[in-house]
């Protein structure tokens, strides 16, 4: 194999989408501030492109959005929040509530103020909320476009947030230094967050749209066997991660606060719920995807499921309230299984009742099986012998008068299982599906996605 082949097997030659599927923690950096201080301009500057809407009208950022960002080799998620209105409702206004949720979800915060306007009462209100949240904060004084304006930043020492960093989001001045400090804050937060898993415990995320029974299932599984792993200092929030003992085995459940808090009742909560779900999936090894069997499967249900599959996580599909279903509803769901769930026919599936505990004892077997498959590695010799057999049984269809053939294959990695196939020509999608289906029939892989990459190599002619 040449250097390009080695890159492919190691993962360096994979597409950007495939790299993102691998497990890696992504810190969340929220950009907050009152309206028209330049938050979206700063977001665009960090991203290196015009992604956020920027106007001179206060409050233009109505939809809160997140972006994948990178600085100095560190990947993180950047959240652009709405402005804080200094109206009669103050901190309790709807938009302030949304921004407060964003801060709650973030690992660190960049607080943007306007150096040309100076310190305002709204800025001071935001500082009180940030102190209550207990998150690391970097203070950015925007619109300091030149050295002559540096003195304007000194006033913001009064906020008590430490050094004010002078920047010009429009021109890029000082933004690099600001990011260096912000990324240091993210890394420090990561050391004390749930990313640090107690030795030997598998990380589980319990995800699903609101009101499917996540909190009920967590309580049913945990009973009284709970151990707090991580508290957020200075807040009254629930613990972030919890050790839950199920049938004598300890599991680390990710972001149980996100399960128990009724965040969907807040304005804009659908967006923040989605962000929180995505963050939990990125941190976990196994996603328990909960559905309400008594309700039709929604697009949101399928989106949560696809997020976990695309992230390369082991999954178990959990259908709650199954004991309340009549035969007609059960048959309806079984029909859906062959249509809406055709992408994950390989998934482990458990039908249960979180309220009564019916069949919850079946979860641990499914969880263990899914993680065992996620960790599974097939020896190269055994893999190639098997692929040779299925290729002989069903050769690839002719393409342009030629028949692509598999020359060699190897399993490049696990978590999830990733296979690299070297072939004499392009392998059609249908044939790749045939290979995946055959691998599952022979080796199991229940509960885990499989990634297959094909590298085209001409078969060397004998001299």
Curated annotation (Swiss-Prot):
Q: Which domain of life is it from?
A: Bacteria
List each copy of the EngA-type G domain by range. 27-190, 202-375
For this protein, the record's SMART domains field holds: AAA (SM00382)
The KH-like domain sits at 376-458
Does this entry carry the keyword Nucleotide-binding?
A: yes
The record's keywords, sorted A to Z, are: GTP-binding, Nucleotide-binding, Repeat, Ribosome biogenesis
Positions bound to GTP 2: 208-215, 255-259, 320-323
Output the CDD domains linked to this UniProt entry: EngA1, EngA2
Pfam families (alphabetical): KH_dom-like, MMR_HSR1
InterPro entries found in the cross-reference section: AAA+_ATPase, G_ENGA, GTP-bd, GTPase_Der, KH_dom-like, KH_dom-like_a/b, P-loop_NTPase, Small_GTP-bd
**Recorded GO MF terms:** ATP hydrolysis activity; GTP binding; ribosome binding
Q: Which GO terms describe its biological process?
A: ribosome biogenesis
Q: Where is this region: Disordered?
A: 1-20
List ligand-binding residues for GTP 1. Answer: 33-40, 80-84, 142-145
Q: What does this protein do?
A: GTPase that plays an essential role in the late steps of ribosome biogenesis.
Family to which the UniProt record says this protein belongs: Belongs to the TRAFAC class TrmE-Era-EngA-EngB-Septin-like GTPase superfamily. EngA (Der) GTPase family.
Subunit details: Associates with the 50S ribosomal subunit.
- Protein name (Swiss-Prot/TrEMBL): GTPase Der
From which lineage does this chain's organism come? Bacteria, Bacillati, Actinomycetota, Actinomycetes, Bifidobacteriales
